[in-house]
C-alpha cells in the first residue's frame, strides 16, 4: 500500500486528500447556502464536496464516520431551479455521475448524506436545514 509520506505537503493542515483533491469536514451546523459560502471563504476554489467516483464517495464516508455517525452532512449537490436537474457544485449534472446513488424524492432541493445509508446514499433535504458539511478543492 502507498504511504502518505509524499503527500504530506499536498493539502493544507487539517485537510484530507483523495487523488488530486483536498477535503475537510466542518462539524458546525449551517444551511446549504451558508455552508457553500463558508467553503469558498475558507479556501479559494473550494465548494461543498462534489463526487467524481465511487472511491471518492468511500473516502467521504470514512471522513464523516471519523467525526460522527448520526448527523446528516451537506454535500455539493443541489437541484437547479431552472432545469430541475440535480447538479454538483463543480457544474456537472448529477446524472453523469452514477458513482453515488441518491434519492431526490424527499422534497427539498439540496443533498445530504445520512447515517441511515451509512453516508453512502444522498437524500434530498430542505436547504434551510442546518447540517454539518464537507468542503473540497483542487490545490
Briefly describe each language-model feature range:
Residues 1-139:
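Extracellular, disulfide-bonded carbohydrate-recognition/adhesion ectodomains
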Amino acid at each position: 500500500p502507498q504511504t502518505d509520506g509524499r503527500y504530506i505537503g499536498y493539502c493544507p493542515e487539517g485537510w484530507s486528500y483523495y487523488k488530486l483533491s483536498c477535503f475537510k469536514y466542518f462539524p458546525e451546523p449551517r444551511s446549504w447556502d451558508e455552508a457553500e459560502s463558508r467553503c469558498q471563504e475558507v479556501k479559494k476554489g473550494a465548494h461543498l464536496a462534489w463526487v467524481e467516483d465511487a472511491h471518492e464517495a468511500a473516502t467521504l464516508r470514512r471522513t464523516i464516520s471519523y467525526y460522527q455517525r448520526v448527523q446528516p452532512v451537506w454535500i455539493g449537490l443541489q437541484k437547479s431551479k431552472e432545469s430541475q436537474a440535480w447538479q454538483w457544485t463543480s457544474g456537472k449534472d448529477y446524472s453523469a455521475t452514477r458513482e453515488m446513488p441518491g434519492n431526490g424524492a424527499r422534497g427539498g432541493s439540496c443533498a445530504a448524506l445520512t447515517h441511515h445509508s451509512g453516508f453512502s446514499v444522498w437524500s434530498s433535504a430542505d436547504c434551510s436545514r442546518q447540517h454539518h458539511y464537507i468542503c473540497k478543492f483542487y490545490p
